[in-house]
């Protein structure tokens, strides 16, 4: 259906002159120009030129049409060329008549293509004729009711009151010259002939028509793709660095990993893994292209399968652990803790592995014209929805729910005990959750925009294809819509790891973790750097659980004394999952 829509666009542009419903008489017999594309395809030399028509313009129009027939099929093309030549350059018959006053008058008449010739072309070209070449239908008629493709002959009547009344019967033209070259499809560069390049059993070829495929690489946004790639690489590198820092801080250095730390650690791991898939692709030019001309990589190309699995696993990991972070924040704002965290852990990781492996079993990991190796849905299948979008929407729904509930709890907390420090920390976490929610929502919503604009994309490709069929491809530029949204999508996806760093990586507790890390102290001691790099001494207070402001013992003690008046902010706990509350932090 996509190929059909594409052809409708380009043929409607070029076949306007064929759609004339008038047969104009009073024309002239002209020699078929050697520059005519039909010069070698007709067995006569004179054709009927309608009054007002130009031979030069006629030659150009027919040449453009024949070039566009490269987008049809080997069965249709030669028959369509033959029919178009007979219709555009009808054989001219001259009738010389003598009037009653002994004056001679000449009548030039066209010999129209026979219906039998039309039927030969109609069968292989039926889909094209029915949809956009209706005037080439064998039942078509001129505006005066005369058949365009007569069965045997056409009657022409000329009357002049009191002077003459002539009737002429002109037999139809059944000329057929088979040209072997006419059946060869010559796809205009940079398109490739599917007959020469499509390998049986291989997939991920993109057909423009039944005979022509896109070459690889193919840029939807020419001249802008490199800008997107560089932006994506830069932002992803920043995100990777911040995620790596979060992994060190909450997964390697802590003396004890709490539930909140594990959630942040899992999210950061997902960000690093997602970035890794981009780094693998960036090591190879035109990564999406296979070694076979015109074929985009599919799951049979192991590197494409690997990057697809890595990206899917990393993206789903970050998406699934984002609501867990929000849930932990919501529970903490209620001065409680998560029960049965181990069950959540098992459930989330199991679902992540299943959703990553499922498309692989269906053979759906492949590159496309617009995306790198991931789940391919060009065939309209539901693999992307089942394996990514629906689970992601569920996760985003939970993220939204817990963010709203957290806002309510924080507002109640502030109303009872106003504290700007607590409010600032809570607002920072809430804003981080909202940014994550926006990023994930925008990234998933872009799919619906792209699908809604699919016809617009094919219109743009149609204009581009018309251009390359006429002349130098380097002068033809594809103007596809949606570049701004595509660029914004690159940004929002690339900064996911950086967002979680802003929310949790800049908390004062991070400094505390690094200072109190026994692993870091051991490394410094082994390297002989412990005398040069002094870490803070480990506190013996069992109530040092907030850590959201200040790092000295005096500040922590002051914080404990004030705990009955105002609960501290739900920051990242270094010893347990309960912040200091009105029981002085005792659990």
Swiss-Prot record:
Primary subcellular site in the record, as a coarse category: membrane
Biased composition (Low complexity): 539-552
PROSITE patterns in UniProt: FZ
Residue spans, topological domain Extracellular: 21-232, 282-304, 362-387, 443-490
GO cellular component, one term: membrane
Membrane topology: Multi-pass membrane protein
Biased composition (Polar residues): 572-587
Keywords: Disulfide bond, Glycoprotein, Membrane, Receptor, Signal, Transmembrane, Transmembrane helix
Disulphides: 29-92, 38-85, 76-125, 118-138
Signal peptide range in chain numbering: 1-20
Cytoplasmic-side segments: 254-260, 326-340, 409-421, 512-587
InterPro entries membership: Frizzled_dom (IPR020067), Frizzled_dom_sf (IPR036790), GPCR_Fz/Smo-like (IPR050949)
Family to which the UniProt record says this protein belongs: Belongs to the G-protein coupled receptor Fz/Smo family.
Protein's recorded name: Frizzled and smoothened-like protein P
């Amino acid at each position: 259906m996509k190929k059909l829509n594409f052809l409708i666009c380009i043929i409607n542009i070029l076949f306007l002159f064929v759609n004339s419903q008038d047969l104009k008489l009073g024309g002239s017999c002209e020699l078929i120009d050697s520059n005519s594309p039909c010069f070698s395809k007709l067995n006569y030399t004179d054709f009927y030129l309608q009054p007002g028509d130009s031979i030069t313009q006629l030659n150009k129009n027919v040449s453009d049409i024949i070039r566009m027939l490269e987008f049809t099929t080997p069965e249709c093309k030669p028959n369509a060329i033959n029919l178009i030549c007979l219709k555009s350059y009808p054989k001219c018959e001259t009738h010389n008549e003598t009037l009653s006053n002994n004056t001679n008058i000449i009548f030039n008449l066209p010999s129209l293509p026979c219906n039998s010739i039309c039927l030969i072309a109609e069968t292989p070209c039926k889909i094209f004729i029915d949809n956009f070449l209706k005037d080439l239908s064998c039942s078509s008629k001129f505006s005066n009711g005369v058949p365009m493709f007569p069965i045997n002959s056409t009657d022409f009547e000329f009357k002049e009151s009191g002077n003459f009344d002539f009737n002429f019967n002109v037999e139809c033209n059944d000329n057929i010259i088979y040209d072997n070259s006419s059946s060869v499809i010559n796809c205009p560069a940079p398109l490739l002939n599917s007959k020469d390049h499509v390998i049986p059993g291989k997939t991920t070829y993109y057909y423009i028509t039944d005979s022509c495929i896109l070459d690889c690489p193919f840029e939807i946004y020419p001249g802008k793709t490199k800008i997107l790639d560089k932006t994506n690489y830069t932002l992803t590198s920043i995100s990777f660095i911040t995620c790596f820092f979060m992994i060190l801080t909450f997964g390697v250095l802590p003396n004890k990993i709490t539930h909140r730390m594990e959630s942040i650690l899992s999210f950061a791991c997902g960000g690093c893994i997602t970035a890794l898939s981009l780094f693998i692709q960036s090591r190879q030019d035109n990564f999406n292209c296979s070694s076979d001309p015109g074929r985009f990589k599919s799951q049979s190309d192991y590197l494409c399968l690997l990057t697809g699995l890595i990206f899917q696993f990393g993206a789903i990991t970050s998406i699934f652990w984002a609501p867990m972070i929000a849930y932990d924040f919501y529970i903490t704002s209620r001065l409680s803790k998560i029960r049965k965290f181990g069950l959540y852990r098992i459930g989330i990781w199991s679902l992540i592995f299943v959703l990553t492996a499922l498309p692989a079993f269906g053979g759906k990991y492949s590159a496309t014209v617009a995306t790198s190796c991931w789940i391919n849905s060009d065939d309209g299948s539901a693999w992307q929805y089942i394996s990514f979008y629906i689970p992601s929407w569920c996760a985003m729904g939970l993220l939204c729910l817990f963010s709203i509930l957290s806002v309510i709890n924080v507002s109640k907390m502030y109303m009872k005990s106003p504290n700007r420090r607590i409010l600032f920390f809570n607002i920072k976490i809430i804003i981080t959750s909202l940014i994550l929610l926006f990023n994930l929502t925008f990234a998933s919503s872009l799919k619906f925009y792209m699908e809604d604009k699919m016809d617009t994309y094919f219109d743009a490709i149609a204009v581009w294809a018309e251009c390359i069929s006429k002349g130098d491809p380097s002068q033809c530029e594809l103007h596809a819509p949606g570049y701004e949204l595509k660029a914004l999508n690159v940004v929002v996806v690339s900064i996911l790891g950086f967002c979680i760093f802003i929310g949790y990586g800049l908390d004062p507790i991070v400094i505390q973790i690094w200072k109190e890390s026994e692993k870091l102290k051991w490394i410094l001691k082994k390297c002989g750097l412990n005398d040069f790099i002094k870490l803070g001494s480990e506190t013996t207070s069992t109530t040092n659980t907030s850590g959201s402001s200040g790092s000295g013992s005096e500040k922590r003690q002051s914080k404990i004394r004030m705990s009955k008046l105002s609960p501290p902010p739900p920051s990242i706990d270094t010893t347990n999952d309960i912040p200091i509350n009105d029981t002085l932090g005792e659990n």
